[in-house]
Amino acid sequence: MSQAFLPFSRPSIGDEEIAAVEQVLRSGWITTGPKNQALEEQFAQYVGSRHAVALSSATGAMHVTLLALGIGPGDEVITPSQTWVSTANMISLLGATPVFVDVDRDTLMTDAARIEAAITPRTKAIIPVHYAGAAFDLDPLYALADKHGIAVIEDAAHAAGTRYKGRHVGSQGTAIFSFHAIKNMTCAEGAMFVTDDEALANRVRMLKFHGLGVDAYDRLTHGRKPQAQVIEPGFKYNLADINAAIALVQLERLDAINARRTELATQYLQKLEGLPVQPLAVPNYPQQHAWHLFILRIDSERCGMDREAFMKGLQEQGIGTGIHFIATHLHTWYRQRAPHLSLPDTEWNSARLCSIPLFPDMTDQDLDRVVGAIEHLMGKRP
């Protein structure tokens, strides 16, 4: 009998999450309401930030954060190309220019030195990425940003539970976390913006809901007049309480979820040692890795096959994979606008990286199945 297909990711949803959704559905208040408020308060406390704003996606959060910081035509925003395309898309849609920097070949994260070389008088923001669950080296970055007076937005989409030198990432400034279906904590779709800047938090909160000073639940609970005024034109990026209810349960489980991810990643590192596949390196500064993804680099000279053949080989054995990510500057729209941009280490990884299964409900037997399949492809097992 053939084994069931093993996806590269699967959300860990149990009876508690289902009960939480049912409670909201029966409450009569299913859109933004008390669950959002509780989620914001608890997430801010978990991270160590003064303010948190829940939104419907990290893309929407990035959009209104950039807008709230005044990013617009003529401005430049520095970010690695080795990230999801939504960051550059939001920069571009505001009329600003994404300035792509290269990454370290083995961690897939950039650093303060590469960023400093890209700073110009037009630079208005820097967006570092905590990649695959690892923490970006923040101290040199914030020293650089303070020196030049440039805003920092930490892209923490992969980093719920990640810590840097004992502090949760995002607690030093402004950050955006994703609750997408494959993330360490999920609510299907959703995000959290965190900051210690009250004025920035207030503007993000306003922009996420039409530019109004209040939402429907705010009016209900505080008795404000229903004729809310537009302070400035905004968007519709609020999170429904159905989603927030799931996220609240996931937040309670997050440390346990990440502990299991760490167990699995540790097994992978041990059992894949000696094979020609190349896992990402763990940065050598103090941090707590959340292991959002387990990424291999499949180099044809080392492995005897390219990434596409490797992924096809795992697919034929009933194992799913992913690519995180094709470098942004290689996408058609961005390549047309910067045809000569060369980022060698980004491009080397973009052509070779492959995410293999890693999710908290995986069993040790699932992991051994993946390792065995890789050994088979590498000629180490019949």
Curated annotation (Swiss-Prot):
Source domain of life: Bacteria
Transmembrane segments: none
Alphabetic keyword roster: Aminotransferase, Antibiotic resistance, Lipid A biosynthesis, Lipid biosynthesis, Lipid metabolism, Lipopolysaccharide biosynthesis, Pyridoxal phosphate, Transferase
One Pfam short name: DegT_DnrJ_EryC1
Gene Ontology biological-process annotations: lipid A biosynthetic process; lipopolysaccharide biosynthetic process; response to antibiotic
Gene Ontology cellular component list: membrane
UniProt pathway: Nucleotide-sugar biosynthesis; UDP-4-deoxy-4-formamido-beta-L-arabinose biosynthesis; UDP-4-deoxy-4-formamido-beta-L-arabinose from UDP-alpha-D-glucuronate: step 2/3; Bacterial outer membrane biogenesis; lipopolysaccharide biosynthesis
N6-(pyridoxal phosphate)lysine modified-residue sites: K183
Stored InterPro entries: ArnB_NH2Trfase (IPR022850), DegT/StrS_aminotransferase (IPR000653), PyrdxlP-dep_Trfase (IPR015424), PyrdxlP-dep_Trfase_major (IPR015421), PyrdxlP-dep_Trfase_small (IPR015422)
EC number: 2.6.1.87
Catalysis performed (reactions): UDP-4-amino-4-deoxy-beta-L-arabinose + 2-oxoglutarate = UDP-beta-L-threo-pentopyranos-4-ulose + L-glutamate
Subunit-structure text: Homodimer.
PANTHER family on file: DTDP-4-AMINO-4,6-DIDEOXYGALACTOSE TRANSAMINASE, TRANSAMINASE
Protein family (similarity comment): Belongs to the DegT/DnrJ/EryC1 family. ArnB subfamily.
Functional summary from the UniProt entry: Catalyzes the conversion of UDP-4-keto-arabinose (UDP-Ara4O) to UDP-4-amino-4-deoxy-L-arabinose (UDP-L-Ara4N). The modified arabinose is attached to lipid A and is required for resistance to polymyxin and cationic antimicrobial peptides.
Stated name of the protein: UDP-4-amino-4-deoxy-L-arabinose--oxoglutarate aminotransferase
